[in-house]
Amino acid sequence: MLSPKRVKFRKQQRGRMRGIATRGNTIAFGQFALQAQECGWITSRQIEASRRAMTRYVKRGGRIWIRVFPDKPVTMRAAETRMGSGKGNPEFWVAVIKPGRILFEMGGPEITETIAREAMRLAQYKLPLKTKFLILNSQESETLVTPEV
């Protein structure tokens, strides 16, 4: 599973997820992509489960690019622990996702739209976010629209 080799600080605050993704929101490597529609955290286990689902369906047909990396530690305290006495230990790693972020890309000479769409659908089931399937040529028509608040 994905995790940083070393970090400057072991523990982080939770933070806030505001706005839309300004980086990593366009297709860069493949012809097809899975784009997040809402904000949230994706754990390294969920990324790995999605990757496995896609590679099993595609077999040796094409190439898959993972465009997110879990670099935020999530700490937890032991169950039935009293309040106080510091912050818990890092238990797992998450990637912070904003709307519009490209999560996975897929491409290759043997990958058709139907194969890519089905593989991305299988990966979508493993994720806790709403996502959208994108195609490189028609990306302008399927851009993310932000709701007026």
Swiss-Prot record:
This is Large ribosomal subunit protein uL16c. Its main location: plastid. SUPFAM superfamilies: Ribosomal protein L16p/L10e (SSF54686). It comes from the Eukaryota. InterPro entries: Ribosomal_uL16, Ribosomal_uL16_bact-type, Ribosomal_uL16_CS, Ribosomal_uL16_dom, Ribosomal_uL16_sf. Keywords: Organellar chromatophore, Plastid, Ribonucleoprotein, Ribosomal protein. The keyword Lyase does not apply. One of its GO terms (biological process) is mitochondrial translation. It is found in: Plastid, Organellar chromatophore. Belongs to the universal ribosomal protein uL16 family. GO terms for cellular component: mitochondrial large ribosomal subunit; organellar chromatophore; plastid. Part of the 50S ribosomal subunit. It comes from Paulinella chromatophora.
